[in-house]
Amino acid sequence: MGMKESMEISSLTPAMKQYAEVKALHKDCIVLFRMGDFYEIFFEDAVTASKILDITLTSRNKGKEDSIPLCGFPYHASSTYIPKLIEKGFKVAVCEQIEDPKLAKGVVRREVVRIVTPGLVVDTANLHAKENNFLAAVFPLEHHIGLAFLDISTGEFRVSDFQDIRFFETELAALDFREIMVPQGSGKQGFLKAFAGRENSCRLDEFPDEYFDRESALGRLQDYIRKEDLEDLGLKDCPAVIGAAGAVLRYVEETQKSRLTHINRLQWYSAAEYLVLDETAKRNLELFKTIQDNRTAGSLFSVLDETVTAMGGRRLRWWLNYPLVDPEKIKARLAAVAEIRENHLFRENLRKVLSEVYDMERLAGRIALGVANGRDLIALKQSLKNLPVLKNLLADSNSFMLDRIQDGIDELPDLYDLIEKAICDSPPVTLREGGIIKEGYDEERDRLFFMTRDGRRWIAALEEKERKRTGISSLKVGFNNVFGYYIEISKANSALAPEDYVRKQTLVNAERYINQELKEYEATVLNAETRCREREYDLFMQVRECAAAEITRMQATATLLADLDALASLAEVAEKYNYCCPVVDLEDRIEIDVGRHPVVERMSLRDGFVPNDVVLDTDENRFLVITGPNMAGKSTYIRQVALIVLMAQMGSFVPSSRARIGVVDRIFTRIGAADSLIRGQSTFMVEMNEVAQILCHATGRSLVILDEVGRGTSTFDGLSIAWAVAEYLHDKNWIGARTLFATHYHQLTELAVAGTGYRNYNIAVKEWGDRIIFLRKIVPGGTNRSYGIQVARIAGVPEEVIVRAREILDNLEKGEMDEVGMPRIARSRKRKPRNPGQLNLFMSERERVIEELAALNISRVEPHDALNMMLNWQERLKEG
């Protein structure tokens, strides 16, 4: 509670004492304390929350020494405010009133009913529909690291074991966890500290060792997962995994205050089953977010995602995160995609029916968590209604995956019939206001409902009868929550009130009465309304419990529908963008004809996208050196090769006319210069870190794409490093990986002379006088020209600078140097000042630029650095 407030507990009111007790048990949470129709927040929590939620901070006992900081919001707005606290990494304890205040003797009893944390969000309105929200536990033990992670909204629960910390770090980055549990002391380890410091809003908490205790963890696992399934996973010899999984389950039970039936399946996954993509590769290839603005639009996922269900979107994201390495599994996906693609009407109908299916995975989770309302059950019913149609559509399918899906879909007719009979088609959101159960489902509910309805009719009849009896035409019978039913007569007519009328309330212009007849019927009607609402609530809970009993069946079908939607999405994309079905095998050859970049080709390019071929193997075409000017398309080309390989291994068709992909185990990238100045790393250090990761982990089955290695340091250092890296990757005694190496060091083309397996390619350029046109075509052979000056002209560098640069370049190519290596022309050329009368003291910016250019030793400047200088000069010339 942080009571600087150092207020003695004894001095607090009973309600605040109750709050203090709750806060003492949940010190790491912001406590939402239910008081009537509001959640109130006190003390330091209030100060923190008011800033995050942008709500007024006030105080109890304002102006007094014992004032208590206070803020709050209406309970019905919790779905708006709680996510804001969670987004900032806080945990929130929701403390509810658990008895009717009218019946309470003394202070109302309250209890924490759930704890919401970044990794344990159950409100689907506050989750990204097509992304998982994972809570993870990490348990380092001896030479193993156990990892377990759970999405509580779907029940997806996975585990893995790592003996190599670098593979483990790759997994941490891959899954973008929202919250990580570690044993006390483990948070000090470098790998977790580094991870927690990344910009991924991940909460990292240390827990007592008892959470990871093997025996209690195993017992807890056996409570959730069938014994046979646990034995099949072979967890007996994986104590680190058992400890991590048990910690997750204990934390879930403590925060949700119950055992959750939708957590009933544990899945083991191994990095060996998938193409490994580290954080750098995913960023550089822009799989899920663009580098420039961190948006989904413009990423590979945005191109491939034509899913029509949330669960299909999550499945597609998983496939993209974890491409396969088993050709048979890849071929099974490709065959299903091909079958859906081939039949336009089938594909259209399939996607139309799927679009009417709700997120059954998260609906099952809400039912298991006890938070599903009437609308959730109607969404489930609507989804179940479409299952027979889907089964019928898939009845004649030929591919293994579609056949398996068709066989496995459980229509759950019994559950559909129950919801259809019991729940109104348009139920209210809340469960206690009535109107949720259909007429005819329950006799007792109907009796109470009709009594309520008929009672209202009786009231109308009473009003008419009393008007006639009293002769007061303005008499009316009404109702309010405070006084109940009443007979209202205006002040002018109050003298006409019969003797059996008992005054109930006096208003400015009227008197309100009740008589014995109205009093008796009031008790009957009001009691019937209350009992009817209570009966409907009880009936709904029974229906929801029946649905909860079928959670496993729901989840099994939802899993199949997610697969089906992801397959249909890939088929839709393949047809829409004219992709081909790749041949995938275990050979070493990668051969792509007329390949395109799947994202770049979708952009509005004036001249259209220029496709290119590639041949890679582990022999004569092992290492491709690609030279050419900046902006010509080297980076796009090497990226597109990596993306096509990745797409093929996830089971997608690919943007080419023909493709044969020999499976790769990892894709490594070194593209661009992403500074990490926040972490104290220079551009060159980032580059060398990424290169080191590649050289330490690449194998002969890896695909490596490198762009401009060595450019972050001096020319000779950079060239030396680039050359040595190329040799190391090429040499089979070291790595021998299939590699595309884009570089501005044209000297590297000489590698092809030094050994076999190297191939030189360059980007074709058409020269037109002093100008160039990028043809974007990859052609055999190297080039020793960078066209830096022409690129500078395209970039808009002033013509005077371009002309002067051309003069200096001509001089350099003639080798006209003085004894200290400075071009004579650069030092001695006389310039015409633009303003002859201006003194040097007031030299113009344009003249300063030309002066700097004249003094430049161009022999020591590479084209890439020259371009940066020219861009700087251009900015200064524009400003000056």
Swiss-Prot record:
Cellular component GO terms held in the UniProt record: cytosol
InterPro entries from the UniProt entry: DNA_mismatch_repair_MutS, DNA_mismatch_repair_MutS-lik_N, DNA_mismatch_repair_MutS/MSH, DNA_mismatch_repair_MutS_C, DNA_mismatch_repair_MutS_clamp, DNA_mismatch_repair_MutS_core, DNA_mismatch_repair_MutS_N, DNA_mismatch_repair_MutS_sf
Residue sites binding ATP per the record: 628-635
Gene3D superfamilies referenced in this protein's UniProt entry, alphabetically: 1.10.1420.10, DNA repair protein MutS, domain I (3.40.1170.10), MutS, connector domain (3.30.420.110), P-loop containing nucleotide triphosphate hydrolases (3.40.50.300)
CDD domains, alphabetized: ABC_MutS1 (cd03284)
Keywords noted in UniProt: ATP-binding, DNA damage, DNA repair, DNA-binding, Nucleotide-binding
Entry keyword DNA-binding: yes
Record flagged with keyword Plastid: no
Pfam families: MutS_I, MutS_II, MutS_III, MutS_IV, MutS_V
GO MF annotations, alphabetized: ATP binding; ATP-dependent DNA damage sensor activity; damaged DNA binding; mismatched DNA binding
Example of a GO biological process term: mismatch repair
Biological role stated in the UniProt entry: This protein is involved in the repair of mismatches in DNA. It is possible that it carries out the mismatch recognition step. This protein has a weak ATPase activity.
Family (UniProt): Belongs to the DNA mismatch repair MutS family.
Alphabetical list of HAMAP family matching this protein: MutS
Protein name: DNA mismatch repair protein MutS
